Each structure stands twice: as structure tokens, then as C-alpha cells.
């Protein structure tokens, strides 16, 4: 695992799932990896990383077509979203934000894309990438009404909504995609 993301060159920030201290006193962290299969984990030495607490969490309800942002367990933002089509469903599980990418003004992904550690369960390549799932804006050909299922697995948020989400979250923020 490289210390920098390949797309942005920013430091990698991973979600810590567990912590163990060995009898030798050495501490290890179980982290969620941004690779296949979904849910892949690894143990890394705590002494090799900088830890920070993150009070935020994102939950995406597939049934309600809703993205909610929580701060210390309290909902601070709720937005309707469009999700994956039947043939390319949005995967369920515990993930994390891997990268925050500011898109160019003309991008159909809207102003921001929040790449997740999640990957499509059916697409192993998409648009030249590894089939990574993202929370992103929606304009032009990708615009879709909340409550619909037109995407290749990504979570499409209206542009005004993604602008509200972005300042609340950071790489490493947990993202739970639930039924």
C-alpha cells in the first residue's frame, strides 16, 4: 500500500476497524483497504501512521434512496439520491471515503466526486478505472432524479447537495451502504 493516492497524490487515509497490542508492546491497526474484494483489510503498525479521530459518518439507504451525514451519532444532513441500476447495483457494506476529488467545471460528475473504498460487484473496469464506486454530483447526461436507479453503482447527488456533503467529510470517513 503506497502512502499516497495514485489519482491525487494526497496522503492515504484509511478507516481503522480494530486495534491490537502484542505482548511485545507493539500496536497494530486493522484497516479497510481501497481494493478488491470489497471489505478487504490489512494489519499495519500503529507506529507507521498518524491517527486522527473523525466524528463523521455517512449512511446511504438503498431502500429510501437517501444519504445521511452524522456527526457524533446525530443526523446533520439528509439528501435524496439516485443509485445503481438493477444490472449494476450499488454494493452494500461498510466502506470509507478514499479520495475527495474536485472535478472540472464541465464534468458530468458535478463539482465533486468522493471515491469510496467500494467497488462494483459486477463491473471490474469502468471508464478506464477499476470499477470504484463514488458519491458524486450529477449534471448533464448523468443528471438523475432522487429515488431512481440509473447509475453503474455510484451514488448520484444533486450538485447543490454534494456541495453540502463535501465540507462535512474527509478521506477515512466511514460510509455504510445499507438495504
Locations of regions flagged by a protein language model:
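SH3-family beta-barrel domains
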Residues: 7, 22-25, 55-57, 125-127
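Boundary regions of SH3-family modules and the immediately adjacent low-complexity/disordered segments
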Residues: 32-60, 71, 77, 83
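Gly/Thr-rich phosphate-binding beta-strand-loop-beta motif of the actin/hexokinase/Hsp70
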Residues: 67
Amino acid at each position: 500500500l503506497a502512502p499516497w493516492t495514485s489519482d491525487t497524490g494526497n496522503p492515504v487515509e484509511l478507516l481503522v476497524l480494530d486495534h491490537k497490542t502484542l505482548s511485545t508492546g507493539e500496536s497494530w491497526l486493522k484497516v479497510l483497504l481501497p481494493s478488491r474484494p470489497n471489505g478487504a483489510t490489512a494489519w499495519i503498525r500503529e507506529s507507521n501512521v498518524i491517527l486522527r479521530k473523525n466524528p463523521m459518518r455517512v449512511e446511504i439507504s438503498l431502500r429510501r434512496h437517501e444519504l445521511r451525514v452524522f456527526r457524533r451519532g446525530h443526523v446533520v444532513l439528509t439528501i435524496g439520491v439516485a443509485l445503481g441500476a438493477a444490472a449494476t447495483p450499488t454494493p452494500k457494506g461498510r466502506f470509507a471515503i478514499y479520495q475527495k476529488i474536485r472535478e472540472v467545471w464541465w464534468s458530468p460528475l458535478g463539482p465533486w466526486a468522493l471515491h469510496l473504498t467500494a467497488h462494483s460487484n459486477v463491473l471490474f473496469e469502468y471508464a478506464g478505472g477499476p470499477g470504484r464506486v463514488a458519491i458524486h454530483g450529477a449534471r448533464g447526461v448523468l443528471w438523475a432524479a432522487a429515488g431512481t436507479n440509473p447509475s453503474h453503482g455510484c451514488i448520484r447527488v444533486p450538485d447543490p447537495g454534494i456541495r453540502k456533503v463535501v465540507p462535512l467529510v474527509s478521506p477515512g470517513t466511514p460510509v455504510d451502504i445499507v438495504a
